[in-house]
Amino acid sequence: MIYNHIILLIYHIYLNSNLNLTNMKKIILLMSIVFLYSCNNTNTVGEVESSNNNYERNLEVAKEFMKLHEMEDLESQIAMLSDDLIHEPPRYGADLQDKDGFINDIKGYQDNFENMKFTPTYWLPGSDSLGNLNGSVRVYGVWTATHTPTQKSVNLKSYHYWDFDESGLMIQVGDYFDATGMMMSLTSDE
């Protein structure tokens, strides 16, 4: 049906232009090739779905990781990390970190905060740079805690993402929140 509309459109262009019959035949041939090629695209839905097969498993791992952080169970968290982990920390101007840098950050939070609680707003599947679901996990939420040295409360909106390797270990992690602003508020006299 759409092909008929295209032919009618081309015929209308021919009638209202200075194109000769030879040029119109070339245009029709070209449009036919484009149309036939577009009908021959492969179904990529199966490929996209298959790359997202591990999302449910990875979602449970990410949720467990956050619960373990609330419980300050660093050793169990470390067991969930790939040796090749890359971490994108939330601090202003910070470079990417390796596994040891990420573990050091986790330990720093656990040593300096108590009653940590993460309340998720949205758990979402992640995607690659083309928008294809890829099994990664991301979440928006709010951290609440008490800063142990000052006993000041924290209420911090955050975004986190996790990419996983084939065995279900975290291979890339990113944390986005105002870490610098949070620390400055905890050290101010207000």
Describe each region flagged by the PLM.
Residues 74-129, 133-135:
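A solvent-exposed, acidic/Ser-Thr-rich amphipathic alpha-helical stretch
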Residues 39-75:
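Short, low-complexity N-terminal intrinsically disordered segments enriched in polar/charged residues
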Residues 171-190:
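Low-complexity, intrinsically disordered terminal/linker segments enriched in charged
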